[in-house]
Curated annotation (Swiss-Prot):
Belongs to the class-III pyridoxal-phosphate-dependent aminotransferase family. HemL subfamily. Its main location: cytoplasm. The lineage of its organism: Bacteria, Bacillati, Bacillota, Bacilli, Bacillales. It is found in: Cytoplasm. This is Glutamate-1-semialdehyde 2,1-aminomutase 2. It is an enzyme of class 5 (isomerase). It comes from Shouchella clausii (strain KSM-K16) (Alkalihalobacillus clausii).
Amino acid sequence: MGNWTKSIEAFKEAQPLMPGGVNSPVRAFKSVGMNPVYMKEGKGAKIKDIDGNEYIDYVLSWGPLILGHANDVVVEELKKATELGTSFGAPHEYETRLAKLVIERVPSIDVVRMVNSGTEATMSALRLARGYTGRNKILKFVGCYHGHGDSLLIKAGSGVATLGLPDSPGVPESVAQNTLTVHYNDVESVRYVFETFGDDLAAVIVEPVAGNMGVVPPEPGFLETLRTWTEENGTLLIFDEVMTGFRVGYTCAQGEFGVTPDLTCLGKVIGGGLPVGAFGGKREIMEQIAPSGPIYQAGTLSGNPLAMTAGYYTLSQLTKADYSEFARKAERLEAGLSAAAKQHGIPHSINRAGSMIGLFFTDERVYNFEKAQTSDLDLFAAYFRGMLAEGISLAPSQFEGLFLSTAHSNEDIEATIAAAERVFQAIATK
């Protein structure tokens, strides 16, 4: 494998038409030093590009495809839904059906509002938190990505915790100053924020498992401490489970860790591969959202019938037994990748949460973004390119994890481990 002639030509055609030739930056493959590969079709755990190369896929559209590509049930029900109409701008039954499933399985959610993306979900949840508490500031964690809303595109300055600085041109400093940022898993920095800014702290927003720094689980007691201190301070705790929701566990990460937030943001899996997001939580908080309350949120395509249908038939197929099988396969893949790297003297650290795995090229244990950044990016790029040539599709970024689906077979896992052994051997002998 390695013939990507048609992909190269397709990218040349796209570059003058879209910023960087893509509609989301990471897809440009800049960090791995090659042209993006254009995909054409997928089925189960496999995906095929426009040059005819087939891959075992661990990107899965960045996580949503927990049943694999083109699941038969989801596709059939989407065909039926499409024939009835693609959008109504009116209530319909599948909104209610999906809402019932979400409320049944997510411990924190009594009431849920459907939106169109994870970014919409986090932006709306923060507006709700500010409106409900009457406070302005929020606390987020370095390396935790919550979408591209202005108040969330913030990085930390110097010191334990500082007033935020914009992480992108176009974000006003006046907006950034209401966002406080500390390191993930750093309880003492969180304590400082509460002691210094507690009276105006509306919310703490956190990924219960950080998935945008390469899969970093919480340290023991971290989430529990956030829960205790937010309750004591009258601050809302928001779990961003856009990535972890229904992927880390049957009842999401909050069910696995036994920590219940005030609000939860969802996306990815609950849309079955279609654009979707949701936020929900305690009834007394959610009833502040219009039309029940004064805090405004709306969307033309929110709860559209296609996304709701795909989401409903995705979640309705998932069982508790599936998550046990996820764990078994993920443990095997984790162990196999680690053994392959060790065999060839490749420095590495590996983390796992449910069916998410993060492989870092560093000898240091990775428990926050600072440690994730010690990973050798050149080594990752070589690994990515080697695996792609071996027929394994991984995310083209060190700071994204890999995902498993119910469609991944034991043979897929073993083939992936064997490919990694060959790639690591080639890297070690250069």
